């Protein structure tokens, strides 16, 4: 990790990663890096660590999409691939449909917005810190709504640190200012953190990388 403020060195630092799934997804989409959607998130996180750091667990926060059907299928395939990873857990929020007016044409449409991810991440970070399960919380997000748990960690558990890893095309000055360190996830990390083209589940079923993600 880079751009990290000075801290007391230790023989080994336990790291738990907290990944804001849609913040990462929309960052990749903004960068037009669809070929990196097929990410082994555990490997991506591992590739961000320093030699003295050990990845204890990866927590992925997302919501199930329900339309269009082809997008729902691609997400389901990706989630099933993630479920083959032993030290990764998925936490679900939900979509809430909001009626919005188009600025250009004036028509109204239902626009889904993802809910609960920031709350779920905050709860997990604070819970893990309280149970002394980590030395470093690695937050993969640029959502400024996540400043509150960083402040809480610094106040309640000053011996622990929060490092922010910004997804591609994403940044938050507030998170950068509050965190103990930060980095930007780049192409090189993503390129070496992909699942293989085919992923076999425990029951023998083989998952295929979606064609649109190649």
For each feature predicted by the language model, list its residue ranges.
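Short, motif-level signal for alpha-helix interfacial/capping segments enriched in acidic residues
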Residues: 1-4, 120-122
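Nuclease catalytic cores that cleave nucleic-acid phosphodiester bonds
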Residues: 89-214
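Domain-level signal for Mg2+-assisted phosphodiester chemistry and nucleotide/NA-binding surfaces
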Residues: 2-112, 161
């Amino acid at each position: 990790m880079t751009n990290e403020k000075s801290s007391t060195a230790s023989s080994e630092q336990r790291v738990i990663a907290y990944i804001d799934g849609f913040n990462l997804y929309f960052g990749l989409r903004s960068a037009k890096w669809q070929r990196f959607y097929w990410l082994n998130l555990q490997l991506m996180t591992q590739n961000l660590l320093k030699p003295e750091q050990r990845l204890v667990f990866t927590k992925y926060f997302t919501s199930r999409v329900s339309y269009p059907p082809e997008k729902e299928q691609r997400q389901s395939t990706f989630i099933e691939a993630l479920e083959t990873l032993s030290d990764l857990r998925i936490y679900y929020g939900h979509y809430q449909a909001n009626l919005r007016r188009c600025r250009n044409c004036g028509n109204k449409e239902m626009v889904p917005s993802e809910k609960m991810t920031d709350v779920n991440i905050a709860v997990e970070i604070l819970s893990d810190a309280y149970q002394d399960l980590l030395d470093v919380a690695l937050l993969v997000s640029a959502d400024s709504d996540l400043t509150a748990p960083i402040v809480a960690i610094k106040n309640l558990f000053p011996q622990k640190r929060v490092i922010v890893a910004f997804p591609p095309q994403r940044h938050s000055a507030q998170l950068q200012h509050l965190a103990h360190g930060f980095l930007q996830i780049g192409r090189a990390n993503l390129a070496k953190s992909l699942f293989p083209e085919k992923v076999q589940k425990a029951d023998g079923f083989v998952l295929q990388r979606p064609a649109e993600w190649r």
